[in-house]
Amino acid sequence: MSPQTETKASVGFKAGVKDYKLTYYTPEYETKDTDILAAFRVTPQPGVPPEEAGAAVAAESSTGTWTTVWTDGLTSLDRYKGRCYGIEPVPGEENQFIAYVAYPLDLFEEGSVTNMFTSIVGNVFGFKALRALRLEDLRIPTAYVKTFDGPPHGIQVERDKLNKYGRPLLGCTIKPKLGLSAKNYGRACYECLRGGLDFTKDDENVNSQPFMRWRDRFLFCAEAIYKAQAETGEIKGHYLNATAGTCEEMLKRAVFARELGVPIVMHDYLTGGFTANTSLSHYCRDNGLLLHIHRAMHAVIDRQKNHGMHFRVLAKALRMSGGDHIHSGTVVGKLEGEREITLGFVDLLRDDFIEKDRSRGIYFTQDWVSLPGVLPVASGGIHVWHMPALTEIFGDDSVLQFGGGTLGHPWGNAPGAVANRVALEACVQARNEGRDLATEGNEIIREATKWSPELAAACEVWKEIKFEFQAMDTLDTDKDKDKKR
């Protein structure tokens, strides 16, 4: 090669592979108010130091790759790289660590949950140096929160729209979830609404199948709503599931719901995707529709304790993307949910400011500034005997949703709805009178059965029903200390 055409490496660039921790592990780093902070549960492969594993997570979820590249010199790596700034062992677990990672805000597109997750939980979860990886929590800085519109309306606006205050809202998922004709489906909705429920609901997989096309369902459910409203004098709603195969079809269904004058639509935000969800949320805000969110597929992501993503992260993401309700588990029903963990992410959904509290699984203080709150929905295997516990656990700003606990009543849907409404009103009144729902709950329900035969029949049917299984997702504790106790 002639001297004129010879190319020399630029000064300062050295090709090859070097440990991630040399660049991305920075324990001396002081986090900024504008950083997005993440807490990862890291299980390294044998022989991989925790500092290297944490640094690898920071690198692969921000600016790094497996080898040094010359284009690093064309940007300010210190400005844009993620940093692992802390490592701590997980109590009671061998070879598991919490790695704290800080991401500069400029790594993320404004107002895009999709981009945020693509960066933070994109390729890194398949990284070979890690046996398992779980995103436990995120701190969203106020500077980034303000780029999101959040829920279409929020808790207070929903109460004003419905003219319902001072108690949890009551709902019911129509069962069987698949197979009913549109007319029979609408009839089931009407019976539940006239019996005293505030809402009925499409199940997550009710979209537009051969046995019941979406337009027919919307029409018959709207008829049920208006008929029940005329008879009861209360505002009613049905969560019309607008989830579809394309965003265009989803929005077409939402437009039709608005034209019918119904108050609320529904979306499966994980299977539908965050881009679709945010688009639907914007439409609902602009057109006065409430938005109910179902979390179908969440357990695929969040149920394993050492790999995936905790639901508190999915809950925060939903508040940013937009939704007025979201299913949150029940603590007492058939679906997964430990009490302290559940109450932790319920607060993250509803409150404006949440302090760090590791006893409830909250790793970071979170300030939502002016972003509206989301109503948690307790649903799954609950019935009238659970009403005192649900009222005590979730409080007024919640939706208590009884599917089988309404439709399984021996006298039919309307008496099932009556039983739930009577049980709720009895619990709210007892609480307001200063009684302890946690210790007097069963007595309160028994007293109410004396003047409600519908409630008495429901209590008899479900008196022996319990779902006593240990939760998979539990708080971290020192197992050796627990054994000594």
Swiss-Prot record:
Modified residues (N6,N6,N6-trimethyllysine): 14
Positions of post-translational N6-carboxylysine modification: 201
In-chain residues carrying the UniProt-annotated modification N-acetylproline: 3
One of the protein's GO biological processes: reductive pentose-phosphate cycle
Cofactor field: Mg(2+)
The keyword Nucleotide-binding belongs to this UniProt entry's keyword annotation: no
Catalytic function, reaction form: 2 (2R)-3-phosphoglycerate + 2 H(+) = D-ribulose 1,5-bisphosphate + CO2 + H2O; D-ribulose 1,5-bisphosphate + O2 = 2-phosphoglycolate + (2R)-3-phosphoglycerate + 2 H(+)
Any further remark recorded for this protein: The basic functional RuBisCO is composed of a large chain homodimer in a 'head-to-tail' conformation. In form I RuBisCO this homodimer is arranged in a barrel-like tetramer with the small subunits forming a tetrameric 'cap' on each end of the 'barrel'.
UniProt modification remark: The disulfide bond which can form in the large chain dimeric partners within the hexadecamer appears to be associated with oxidative stress and protein turnover.
Alphabetical list of CDD domains matching this protein: RuBisCO_large_I
HAMAP family recorded: RuBisCO_L_type1 (MF_01338)
GO molecular function, one term: ribulose-bisphosphate carboxylase activity
Protein function: RuBisCO catalyzes two reactions: the carboxylation of D-ribulose 1,5-bisphosphate, the primary event in carbon dioxide fixation, as well as the oxidative fragmentation of the pentose substrate in the photorespiration process. Both reactions occur simultaneously and in competition at the same active site.
Alphabetical UniProt keywords: Acetylation, Calvin cycle, Carbon dioxide fixation, Chloroplast, Disulfide bond, Lyase, Magnesium, Metal-binding, Methylation, Monooxygenase, Oxidoreductase, Photorespiration, Photosynthesis, Plastid
Complexes and interactors: Heterohexadecamer of 8 large chains and 8 small chains; disulfide-linked. The disulfide link is formed within the large subunit homodimers.
Places the protein is found: Plastid, Chloroplast
Encoding gene, per UniProt annotation: rbcL
Protein name per UniProt: Ribulose bisphosphate carboxylase large chain
InterPro entries hit by this protein: RuBisCO, RuBisCo_large_chain_AS, RuBisCO_lsu_C, RuBisCO_lsu_C_sf, RuBisCO_lsu_fd_N, RuBisCO_lsu_N_sf, RuBisCO_lsuI
Recorded family membership: Belongs to the RuBisCO large chain family. Type I subfamily.
Site (Transition state stabilizer): residue numbering on this chain: 334
Cross-referenced SUPFAM superfamilies: RuBisCo, C-terminal domain, RuBisCO, large subunit, small (N-terminal) domain
